[in-house]
Amino acid sequence: MALGLNVQEPEETCADQNCPFHGELSVRGQTLNGEVASTDMEKTVVVEREYDVKVPKYDRFMKRRSRVPAHAPDCLDLAVGDTVTIAECRPLSKTKSHVVVGVVADEQDGDA
């Protein structure tokens, strides 16, 4: 099933109704990239994003972060530290309105 996003469908299958690939969940709206900060909740991950905000008084930038809870389908194997892509969907709970649609492969060279 095509999501309309530039992500690969996972090879594993799942019986999750809230999976955008194998279930009935449709995605719309914004897509975000971030790092998985927590996998403690069942079928949920917390994705953390860092961004810069300009402080006009000092003419400098300050780091901020936002944490977005997202649904983790069973077909995606997620761990803390993974860089993932999440997409907006209908509200799944009081705080969850995003779903993980893919894991971004980290391109690391041996130039350390």
Curated annotation (Swiss-Prot):
NCBIfam families: PRK08572.1, uS17_arch
Subunit structure: Part of the 30S ribosomal subunit.
A Pfam family hit: Ribosomal_S17
Single GO MF descriptor: structural constituent of ribosome
InterPro entries: NA-bd_OB-fold, Ribosomal_uS17, Ribosomal_uS17_arc/euk, Ribosomal_uS17_archaeal, Ribosomal_uS17_CS
GO biological process: translation
SUPFAM superfamilies registered for this protein in UniProt: Nucleic acid-binding proteins
Source taxon at top rank: Archaea
Task performed by this protein: One of the primary rRNA binding proteins, it binds specifically to the 5'-end of 16S ribosomal RNA.
Organism: Haloarcula marismortui (strain ATCC 43049 / DSM 3752 / JCM 8966 / VKM B-1809)
GO cellular component: cytosolic small ribosomal subunit
Gene3D superfamilies (alphabetical): 2.40.50.1000
Family: Belongs to the universal ribosomal protein uS17 family.
Taxonomic lineage of the native organism: Archaea, Methanobacteriati, Methanobacteriota, Stenosarchaea group, Halobacteria
Name of protein: Small ribosomal subunit protein uS17
Keywords: Ribonucleoprotein, Ribosomal protein, RNA-binding, rRNA-binding
